[in-house]
């Protein structure tokens, strides 16, 4: 685990200090919308806190896997790639935690990640924390969890279910962000729908391949956790320790 910590620290130090990626930056949304999205996040954060206490408790191995999931999401969501018109896109990394601990637990982890990124990396913002939390830490993990359960129960291998969960969770985050921006800034002609299409197309060029890449990375991480501590993965995913699906 020490090696992973050193790697993550080096990646964080390498990250650019000015980021205007898929996180909505400070001061960009009107105050009313900031309060609206923050209010929508509160139920998920309350339920998520209870979920984490119930799942993790004093179990050291569960704490390590939770920390790994948080570090994975922090590093991936802090990376940025140039998109069209001067914007940028990035992975979210929340699929791993959503699969292992559920969407409500990941809402708390994601909110903390976004807060640290806003304070340390100028990535996102404090006033827009609610909006960014709703898209990346509420909607994204929820979609990832639902997709994973559907494909898992449909008899697909663990690898396929995890890949689709992470990739579609990533895409749902960027679609939610596009909707948030469209609602706040409707186009003079075409209104919210036209504005949504504009914002979504800005992200789509880079976000689709990023979602595929994130899906593959998440599968690798799940397989690594399975080798490191299969009982933790089985418990987190509510699977029996024997007879689980293989990738």
From Swiss-Prot:
GO terms for cellular component: ATP-binding cassette (ABC) transporter complex. It is found in: Cell membrane. One of its GO terms (biological process) is cobalamin biosynthetic process. The chain crosses the membrane at residues 27-47, 64-84, 96-116, 119-139, 159-179, 181-201, 202-222. Pathway: Cofactor biosynthesis; adenosylcobalamin biosynthesis. One of its GO terms (molecular function) is cobalt ion transmembrane transporter activity. It is a multi-pass membrane protein. It holds the Pfam family CbiM. Keywords: Cell membrane, Cobalamin biosynthesis, Cobalt, Cobalt transport, Ion transport, Membrane, Signal, Transmembrane, Transmembrane helix, Transport. Residues 1-21 form the signal peptide. The keyword Transmembrane helix applies. The keyword Transmembrane helix applies. Belongs to the CbiM family. NCBIfam families: cbiM, PRK08319.1. Forms an energy-coupling factor (ECF) transporter complex composed of an ATP-binding protein (A component, CbiO), a transmembrane protein (T component, CbiQ) and 2 possible substrate-capture proteins (S components, CbiM and CbiN) of unknown stoichimetry. Part of the energy-coupling factor (ECF) transporter complex CbiMNOQ involved in cobalt import. This is Cobalt transport protein CbiM. It comes from Kyrpidia tusciae (strain DSM 2912 / NBRC 15312 / T2). The lineage of its organism: Bacteria, Bacillati, Bacillota, Bacilli, Bacillales.
């Amino acid at each position: 685990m020490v090696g992973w910590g050193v790697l993550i620290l080096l990646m964080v130090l390498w990250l650019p200090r000015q980021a205007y990626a898929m996180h909505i930056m400070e001061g960009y949304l009107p105050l009313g919308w900031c309060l609206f999205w923050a209010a929508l996040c509160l139920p998920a954060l309350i339920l998520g806190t209870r979920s984490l206490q119930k799942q993790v408790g004093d179990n050291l191995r569960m704490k390590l896997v939770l920390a790994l999931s948080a570090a994975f999401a922090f590093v991936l969501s802090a990376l940025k790639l140039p998109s069209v018109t001067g914007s940028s896109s990035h992975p979210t990394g929340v699929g791993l935690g959503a699969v292992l601990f559920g969407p409500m637990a990941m809402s708390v982890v994601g909110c903390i990640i976004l807060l640290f990124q806003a304070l340390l990396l100028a990535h996102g913002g404090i006033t827009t924390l609610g909006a960014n939390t709703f898209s990346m830490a509420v909607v994204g993990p929820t979609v990832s969890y639902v997709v994973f359960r559907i494909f898992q129960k449909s008899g697909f291998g663990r690898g396929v279910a995890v890949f689709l969960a992470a990739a579609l969770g990533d895409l749902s985050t960027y679609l939610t962000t596009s909707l948030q921006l469209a609602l706040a800034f409707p186009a003079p002609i075409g209104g919210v729908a036209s504005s949504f299409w504009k914002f979504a197309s800005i992200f789509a060029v880079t976000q689709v391949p990023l979602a595929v890449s994130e899906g593959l990375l998440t599968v690798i991480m799940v397989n690594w956790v399975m080798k490191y501590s299969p009982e933790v993965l089985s418990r987190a995913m509510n699977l029996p320790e024997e007879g689980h699906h293989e990738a």
